[in-house]
Curated annotation (Swiss-Prot):
The modification Phosphothreonine is found at T197. SUPFAM superfamilies: Actin-like ATPase domain, Heat shock protein 70kD (HSP70), C-terminal subdomain, Heat shock protein 70kD (HSP70), peptide-binding domain. Induction: By stress conditions e.g. heat shock. Residues 602-614 have a biased composition (Gly residues). NCBIfam families: PRK00290.1, PRK05183.1, prok_dnaK. PROSITE patterns: HSP70_1 (PS00297), HSP70_2 (PS00329), HSP70_3 (PS01036). Residues 625-638 have a biased composition (Basic and acidic residues). Disulfide bonds: none annotated. Coiled coil: none annotated. It comes from the Bacteria. Keywords: ATP-binding, Chaperone, Nucleotide-binding, Phosphoprotein, Stress response. Belongs to the heat shock protein 70 family. This is Chaperone protein DnaK. It comes from Phocaeicola vulgatus (strain ATCC 8482 / DSM 1447 / JCM 5826 / CCUG 4940 / NBRC 14291 / NCTC 11154).
Length: 638
């Protein structure tokens, strides 16, 4: 059985881990970083960049650089108006009332953008493991709705991954933290404040069983919001000083976003920071600079409401778990925003104990996902995970009331049936409107899908018996069925409404993603081949200079001819011609080396061929070959 990787698909950063050698390993990406920015950029020529390369070019390409896409996952157009107003890229209303990202007229679903990030994580794992990866455990915020979970699973499918399990982020963090403590009896609180979401989960573990007692949170509260209060403050300060509105300039706003994020991070270890943005915007034809000092106290005042917003979910989670603060043995901080000192003070004050610093807030969720993957493949035995559904689920009944079938914090998998009847005489059809939330009226909750049960035998109101069954799987994804007990007619739906994607659309997007991955691979191979040729040209020219008159004229001529052929092929970027020219050059140089070796005897040894710096064999006739040496290409930074 292949490896199941663990992926933390974050709002700001993503991370991938795998269980290997009896422990989880966080895998560094191709840039050498253990976390990857959840950013996708579309650049000229149709090229796509993901992660750090995308982040580096964001300032000069703000309208085609996509970040914080997780905030749009599984949401309707109406639910993302606040987010749409914040981002510099264009978000439009698409099919089924869903948000789509418009890049040069091509509309991308949030799932497709997320899939591009997942492909990067998949490739990172494959490069490390040296084998194809097809299965993953992906984490989501504990308070994600059914449609948001479904959208995450779809993103995995588009990326070419079979999602074996969707795991709540705080639960994954608890798994990572408690793996070596699984046989202790402990109650822990996981406080997870990430880039876009906030979760609080209360768990109990002992005897290898990890049980979630309750969870609460806010899927629109996170580091992005803390950045935004700094951005808003800077915009207002500049308006007061210069009378100009920075929000009209997308490039300036992108610079503000980066500066705000940097300032927020610096204020976790310093009491003040300087924000210095020269030439931020021209005013009346004159370039203006933005220079401001932001103190930690001012930042905490700006973010006061956001910090306090973390409190109510904590109270609710403790109440739902039936515990008092003194019952909690340990508090675990997860997510980059949990590093904010005022947030840590709030947590310490609420729980009455200093939070544990024993886990890496940026990596622990991915590590927990890898642990869950190892549990599924039996690499880890004796560990049982009992998670819960974060929100109540039910249907709309007479009078627009929400009737709950499954309550929040019910252990999953879960199944519940209830019998309903018709609201009018001779009614032959009923609409099952599925809802998720905690409010009493249907309109106040989130609609996650609806379907019709037809063919009901005509009868007086209240006589037909319609059995509605809710079935939630281990991923927290819901299936609903309705059955007329009299006729035996049944209708079922796997809730996919808010994601708005059919199986056919997912398959089409998957094919496009694979095609793009293949195109990216070919582009990389092309660059590698050009670099290899460049290296061979450089090493050949150097060796021709070094050898000088020692090289016989009849051997030098074919080398120079092959070298010129390689230069021409390199200039034309003709990969086939490059291969041919490199082979000819190698043959010519080896012939010269063999003759020189014969002339010099054992004293001088063999000269290396031109490809030594490009991973080619130096001298196939020599018995003293060491391992290949790779030349590094350096680019001078001006």
């Amino acid at each position: 059985m292949g490896k199941i990787i663990g992926i933390d698909l974050g709002t700001t950063n993503s991370c991938v881990s795998v269980f290997e050698g009896n422990e989880p390993v966080v895998i560094a990406n191709s840039e050498g970083k253990r976390t990857t920015p959840s950013i996708v950029a579309f650049v000229d020529g149709g090229e796509r960049k993901v992660g750090d390369p995308a982040k580096r070019q964001a300032i000069t390409n703000p309208q085609r650089t996509i970040f914080s896409i997780k905030r749009f996952m599984g949401e309707t157009w109406d639910q993302v108006q606040k987010e749409t107003a914040r981002v510099p890229y264009k978000v439009v209303k698409g099919d089924n009332n869903t948000p789509r990202v418009d890049i040069d007229g091509r509309l991308y679903t949030p799932q497709e953008i997320s899939a591009m990030i997942l492909q990067k994580m998949k490739k990172t794992a494959e490069d490390y493991l040296g084998q194809e990866v097809t299965e993953a455990v992906i984490t989501v915020p504990a308070y994600f709705s059914d449609s948001q979970r479904q959208a995450t699973k779809e993103a995995g499918q588009i990326a070419g991954l079979e999602v074996k399990r969707i795991v709540n982020e705080p639960t994954a963090a608890a798994l990572a933290y408690g793996l070596d403590k699984a046989h202790k009896d402990m109650k822990i609180a996981v406080f997870d404040l990430g880039g876009g979401t906030f979760d609080i989960s209360i768990l109990e573990f002992g005897g290898g069983v990890f049980e979630v007692l309750s969870t609460n949170g806010d899927t629109h509260l996170g580091g992005d919001d803390f950045d935004q209060v700094i951005i808003d403050w800077l915009v207002q300060e500049f308006k007061n000083d210069e009378g100009a509105d920075l929000t009209k300039d997308p490039m300036a706003m992108q610079r503000l976003k980066e500066a705000a994020e940097k300032a927020k991070i610096e204020l976790s270890s310093s009491t003040s920071t300087e924000i210095n943005l020269p030439y931020i915007m021209p005013v009346d034809g004159m370039p203006k600079h933005l220079v401001k000092t932001l103190t930690r106290a001012k930042f905490e005042a700006l973010a006061h409401n956001l910090i306090q917003a973390c409190l109510e979910p904590c109270k609710k989670a403790m109440s739902d778990a039936g515990l008092s603060n003194s019952d909690i043995d340990e508090v675990i901080l997860v997510g980059g925003s949990s590093r904010i000192p005022a947030v840590q003070e709030l947590v310490e004050k609420f729980f009455g104990k200093t939070p544990s610093k024993g886990v890496n807030p940026d990596e622990v969720v991915a590590v927990g996902a890898a642990v869950q993957g190892a549990v599924l493949t039996d690499e880890i035995k004796g560990v049982v995970l009992l998670d819960v559904t974060p929100l109540s689920m039910g249907i709309e009944t007479l009078g627009g009331v929400m009737t709950k079938l499954i309550d929040a914090n019910t252990t999953i998998p879960a199944r519940k049936s209830e019998t309903f009847s018709t609201a009018a005489d001779n009614q032959t059809e009923v609409t099952i409107h599925v809802l998720q939330g905690e409010r009493p009226m249907a309109a106040q909750n989130k609609s996650i899908g609806q379907f019709n049960l037809t063919g009901i035998a005509p009868a007086r109101r209240g006589v037909p018996q319609i059995e509605v069954t809710f079935d939630i799987d281990a991923n927290g994804i819901l299936k609903v069925s309705a059955k007329d007990k009299a006729t035996g007619k049944e209708q079922a739906i796997r809730i996919e409404a808010s994601s708005g994607l059919s199986k056919e659309e997912i398959e089409k997007m998957k094919a496009e993603a694979e095609a793009n991955a293949e195109a990216d691979k070919k582009e990389r191979e092309k660059i590698d081949k050009l670099n290899q040729a460049d290296s061979m040209i450089f090493s050949t020219e150097n060796q021709l200079k070094e050898l000088g008159d020692k090289l016989p004229a009849d051997k030098k001529a074919p080398i120079e001819a092959a070298l010129q052929k390689l230069k021409d092929a390199h200039k034309a970027q003709d990969l086939s011609a490059i291969d041919t020219a490199m082979a000819e050059l190698n043959t010519a140089f080896q012939a010269a080396s063999a003759e020189m070796y014969a002339q010099s005897g054992a004293q001088g040894g063999a000269q290396a061929g031109p490809g030594a710096g490009a991973g080619q064999q130096a001298n196939q006739g020599s018995s003293n070959n060491k391992e290949d040496i790779q030349d590094a290409d350096f680019e001078e930074v001006k």
